Amino acid sequence: MKPELQAFERLTDIIEELRQKCPWDKVQTFESLRYLTIEEVYELSDTIVEDQPEEMKKELGDLFMHLVFYSSIAKEKGLFDISDAINGVCEKLIFRHPHIYGSGEERQNPPSWEEIKMAEGRKSVLDGVPNSLPAMIKALRMQEKAAGIGFNWKNSSLAHDKVMEEYREVQEELHKTDNQDRIEEEFGDLFFALIGWARILGVNPENALEKTNRKFRQRFQKMERDADRTISELGTDELLELWNKAKNETK
């Protein structure tokens, strides 16, 4: 047996034993694990952003454990088992890659990715975008799916023009009203347009913003270290001086 399969079988055996013998593991449910799984995914994301392959290995292991855990609970309930889940995704991969697994004609003229998704029974191209995704990732995924069927800017200049149009609308709204809902709506349109512009340019907006978040954290924490007293006690000019110093030293 391949080492990968041996390791996977070992994990499934351990989870099944823990479900029988460990007080904590015995009482877990789909619902109780859900938020912990979300946390694990974010921890994995951190290792990718921070380029930490050893930590990534650990987090992938934790995530595998969660996946097997869910499958073990499902098996106990008579819903499905881990082999059903794995075979299901295998069938999905084969169906979604007709250019590799299809007939001769399908290999020559494969349908688009979104056409394949619709053939699976989805009523909308956007059905595969989870409602619970963070707003920026959701916007990006909806735009990518719409672009997959041709609903897309022809070039980056048009996407840029849309950004400027939305920016002007924000400015107009700020000058003519104090209706916070309307202002918020216009900012949402501007953010959506910025995400579209970045996407057209080949920039992942989520990754771009995360890099800026990390840069801000690094510089702000240097400000805190360099301050001669608690940072909340400093005035605006002192804060700006510390910020510029941190900015110059952390480029």
Residue ranges and their predicted role:
Residues 1-59, 65-187, 191-251:
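Flexible "arm" and connector segments at domain edges
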